[in-house]
């Protein structure tokens, strides 16, 4: 008999101008902004001014300016905080003053008093020379802003006195860092202010050095930067598609736009690398305008961090730099700007990032991902007092999104013991990893396989750190209309009950439906426990329990503060209406299992029942030795073997040794 089966087997895993109205702009401004000579430095500065041009409102800040001293009365210049560094406010305001002074449409255009405030303010800053305990402010944020300010003032009616500009630039050169000593996004960010300084000084040697360093991170590496699997690492072998991924795209596309059409233009090969990462990874991890929370690193603990609408700028730049893919960028921009729905022009895609221990599954109707950690990668960090409850996020956490906003700003009210996808003891205190910056995983079995459309991922771990004392074998089987999630070998000696959380997201206004013994019930607010329900339906996503289990469901308000997870944020209490669903494995489970199916795009009990009858999913094994799922409709088999074993089903026999 001839069999035509599509088999996916996982055996062992080793492995981002103002153009003022010309009718209103003065001819002097035009002549200054667009010099007639062919000076490359001036060309670059024209583009930089165009990139940052604005028409700011500055009246509020003027009332806080001490004219005699050149400082602001509401700024404590002695602060050295590692985050939200207060003294930088001084430079931010002078920056706005500079754009107000040079913009013909601004009330303070060519205003002598504003000019004097800018000069006096720069003198004050130079003499005071505030310093932050976080190098990033000293070597990136401050010198970048000052460089742009000085470039903008070059087109002012009066320019910054030469002596003041020179000594300011000399200090930036001395104290602003060397890009060659850094990697990835940090290198590009430092190179940016080297570009600004080099243009102001007309220093070709430093400009070439700056551009070489700005471009050098655009290559594949096994260290920090773009990985061969098309993911991105920063702070060691740590997944950072968002966060530092934002920064590297902001900086590299920015520089590439400056140099386009000049002898310093970015090479075709590097543009292609950026294009691949942006189209196939970065923007795929954004649903609508919201990025998946588990690729943001410690940034997850910052308010509004998942909203990536501002990154439309990166795609707009790439539409110019990479016109071959302009239609893809147009679709990305339309989704980010809410001009089209979250599913607009999305195509089926399945990627397992073997370097990053990360899986991304995209369908027009939904996006689902899995983040794991192994001895090859680092757990999600919690440095600078941020992301303080992140511990379990690296242990098989999942995002389930259709619109993209399902988790928007939920995080202060999250129960961080119940991160979606994870199996974890409900400890009184959430552990903090051994290191705040880089803690390597312990699993030697984490990874997946993909044919670019379908795939399977698995994660086996035993965590004995800080009283967690819990392990499991977890697998995810990815198809078109569903994701099948299996767990086996769940063991724990922790004092706390062990839960597998299926989802914890914002509660939708519509009803939650539950079916038990084929009887449907509308769930009210509260906490509930069920023995082997058929399914639960919430916000257009169905959750099916083909092998039963003790299910907990919470449908209620949760509270917390941003400060709880990020000590740079507000202590004001936040309330969120939250939906939580999962398995209660009890205390000290021994070789326990779970099985659930995620079925997005279902909106009614009738559709749920119809799906259950015709989904074609067979769970053929869910043991500590193997997990096997067959999709009869697609004629796809997906298998995970954790150790030696034999699988037999009808005429199929597979032996793994």
Which sequence ranges carry the predicted segments?
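Short N-terminal helix-initiation segments at or just after the protein's N-terminus
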Residues: 31-42, 82-91, 131-138, 193, ...
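Short amphipathic alpha-helical segments that mediate assembly, nucleic-acid/protein binding
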Residues: 26-27, 41, 58, 162-165, ...
